[in-house]
Amino acid sequence: MKIYKKNHFLKILIIFIYLSCNILKVNADGTFSTIQPSTDIKFDKSNLEFVAEWDVSANSISNVVGSTDSSEFSLNYGVWGPTYNYLIAKNKSPSIKANVDYTFSFDFKLGKALGEYNNYQSMVLSFYIPEDIAYFPWEIRTPLYTTNEFSGNFASTSYQSKILTFRSTVDIGNSIMVLRINRATETGPTASSVYFRNMKITIPSKPITTPTDLLTKDSELIVIPKPPISLDLQDLTKCPYLTASDLYNWHDPTIWPNGVVPSPNQNITIPAGKRVLISASSISQTQIYSRIVVPVNSELIFNDQNFTMNIRDIYVQGKFIMGTSLCRYNSFINIIFHGEKTLQDTIAQFYGSKGIAVASGGFISVQGKQYHNTWSKLASNVWSGDRVIWIQDNVNWEVGQQVLITTSVYKDELDNQNEILTIKAIEGKKIEFTEPIKWFKYGSQEYQSEVALLSRRIVFSSDESSSVSTSFGGHILSSGEMQFAGVQLKRMGQKNVKARYPLHYHLGGTLNNSFISDCSVTNSYYRCYTIHGTNNVTLTRNVAYDAFGHCYYLEDGVEVDNRISFNLGAYVHTIGKPAAGASQIGETFYQSSELTQPADSAASCFYITNSWNSFIGNAASGGWAGFAFPNLPKPIGNHRTLNIIPMQYPIKEWQGNTAHSSGYYFEDGASIYVGGNLTFNEANGMLIYNSGRLGRTTYVNGVKNENNVVFDRLNNTKIFLSNLGVGYWGENIEIVGYESHDNTRPVSLFGNVWLHNALVNGQSGNILTKNSETTRQGFRFYDFYVQTIISNTIFRNFIHSTAATKRDEDNVVITATTFSDVFKPQFISATKNITFQNVPQSQIIGHEDVANSGSSRLFNFLDGDGSVTSSFTGKPGIPQIVGSHVSWWKFDDSCLFSTEWNVWVCNKGTKGLANIEFWVPGFMERELEQDPDSYIGSISLFGSGINDERKTLLTRNPGITGVSNMGWYAYFTIGTPNYLRIWTAQIAFGEYIFLAIPYPTGTTFTITSEYDYSNQYTYTITKTTSALAVKQGNGKQYYFDGTHLFLKLVNFMNTGGSWESFDRVGIKIPDVYWTYIYNIRATNTAKPSVNGYFLNLPDVRPSSTL
């Protein structure tokens, strides 16, 4: 029987109904409460621990045998136990709001009559920093809050109630409840017990009122884009179940072979060339359908009706339609996938089992009711016990749907404070839940927890019986065009089975009309949304929560030109042991049956193997990282023979993405992590992943060409509650528009770096981040071979921590990597237009004097406009050179020494910063790492009126950085080498170093300069008549006065071109030039060198008048 078009009136009626259902609601669904009821936080044997100095056993706290009251428990004391013990909660306490009356209550009774050794006098209720609990009972630290010692009727053998009201004067976020129980004496010669029941903290009820401080924007500095406000346009006259005269009902026997409707246990093939409609009455809603094939030129269309379909496999070569872009279905449709774990292909060859596979040339469209926005952010703080929240965007969510509120703590996986709640009532931006919120959630101007809708009317899920124990759910795979919108995918994916993901574009090539929009993936066994070997698709406005392995997943490194926008990923778990490591090396993982993709040891919300894609308005909560950009020197998987280098592609577009609560497993972990290395071992066919440092250089079109180097650029980015906000091991990065809040450090950046228009906030108002011994730094300058410019940046709320034992480990704005004598800084760091808010002067710079460390002695940066140092110098607008604690940096009388910062600060004037290296073949070379205490002399300033000693030490590890256009006097305690090479690593065009080195009287010299890679710049340095002539010359002359050899070091390769420096906002950092060398060969027949060194030379600086 054919299904013909309905009449025009019916079409208009359907359109009206649809629009009425989908309009963004302004009227309430359900009834809002006016009073928030009280909330009880209950304690019993399961969530309390017995702690004492001695007499502790597994039986010290136990359930009461025979009791029907689950709250009842006993404390069981042995003989001669201590006079007090503690009950410590195993879980964190609710947040406690200042100046609010809470109650702590319980019932108590003695196990035997009151006596000399059975006398309980008092108790004390306290709340401690969670980390301090580890010190109990031997070291009791100061609590966040404690009550006075309280008594009660603790002398009865029948239950007596005790209610204690307590009020804190400060807000308390993370804490652990501790109850101290005090006895009059030790426990005595016989065992005894006491009993508790109904122990609880009660959060009081309160009127529900609209907060006066609702946010009107989500960020202070940056702009985070949002999706369009309007709903997608609908035309229900185009619904697939209405519009065609050639549409046949599934239950019509005339279309099937032999005139019989197939049974569920058959392999069912849709008749060739037919368009078949499934309605609720067409199929069994309880039996499991085995396999359905939709051949080429056939279509399987679902009606917009409430129903459930149980299925094992569906293979689509033609079309599978359950709603379209113009006709999104309003009905509640459940597709449940069944099947035991197997690696066999039961859908079709290469397509696995338990799911839907769409062949190349096939088409699938599943589009349910549009809920918009799919996620928002809190508009105000939420406290434990609250049931009503306000969000920042209007939504059309519905009563009974499930909502996620993401965590507001740092270590998401280790302290899960994400919450799923059910809507009781909703109106505009106001939502009431059926149950109280357990944990404090932050929603102030700095940042806000995300609030996401998990429920959808169309649900694809896996049956629990065959899925949960094996992590083997259903999967959707399409090699053709695929459109999914308004669908929830629950318990989907097949853990560690490649290509078996909840929703997956698979080897589709370049598609033209494919998208996944406003869907949700929840409780996924393996990933969330995958783009594999497919280009030009859109993932937008989706939500993902609670998934194993990388979530939004670009698989092989060849996926480009995709648009990934306005998506949320949250609570993403590594597979197996998380990648850790206490150094930049990270950890290495190998492909195995338990870790099919070894990079899942560092599972992230967004995993990006090729950067040439657009990322707009996405948010990541949790994961090993929020956004991971692993380095792939070659594609992997199906594309490993393709001749491209994925890691060389720059980011196509990055605008307004945020991340939080990640980066804590690895010392160098970050919420945005550009690092790690994923390779394919050709010998054994296995993948290898290393989580540590590997650099990348990006080029136009991903093709290596030194003339087409292109910067990665992150625009309008926000990171909070992270270890490192952005960790970038690459060579060229610009971060423009950036907010960092409550991160250990905002960034760790390598190569050419520009951080511009940033807000770095060391401490937000989030009470969950306070009372921590973790300190935070504003920016750590690296130690060598980078170029870093920070401009237009606000640093806020860096306050001294009493727990900090070193300057550079305190809550301080500027620090540097200063541990090494091998890796020493050149002129690599500069600042301009820096602002400090609530930062005491002592916390602006934290330089540490590290023993035997050249990087500590040579710490330096250019304060390009004096804005960093003006609070100390009183010289705003005047550029300053900042150098370490050694007198080497005191180059003129403008220099001031800050004891708070442990640095010298000097007017830059006409000076610059330069770096050279002394090389003695076989003794002191760049590639020969030596002990840090291998001291061989010193280098001092001379001339320019300097009469005192201003020097630093030299070691066998080459490298010295100092002020250019000055006299440098090098003295070698081991003796001056008769052959010395000097690498002019960083001497900018127009600058010089006036170098003096002692030699014995009568020494003659052969001096040349050369470029390692060309003889075009080879010069013979000739003798002139005076040291002054050398200083005023062009760098091609030397002079020896019988005591000192004078040379003017310049780099003849430099011409002043723009390519010779890293230049942003008027600040220039010269490049390190590889490798322009001066060669000095010295001969003396009267006082010859001994083993290559002229010994016992006097240490006398040249004249101060030079």
Curated annotation (Swiss-Prot):
PROSITE patterns: G8. GO terms for cellular component: extracellular region. One of its GO terms (biological process) is aggregation involved in sorocarp development. Keywords: Glycoprotein, Secreted, Signal. Its main location: secreted. Disruption phenotype: Shows no aggregation. It is found in: Secreted. It comes from Dictyostelium discoideum. Glycans are attached at residues 267, 306, 512, 536, 677, 715, 833. Residues 254-380 form the G8 domain. Belongs to the comF family. This is Communication mutant protein F. Residues 1-28 form the signal peptide.
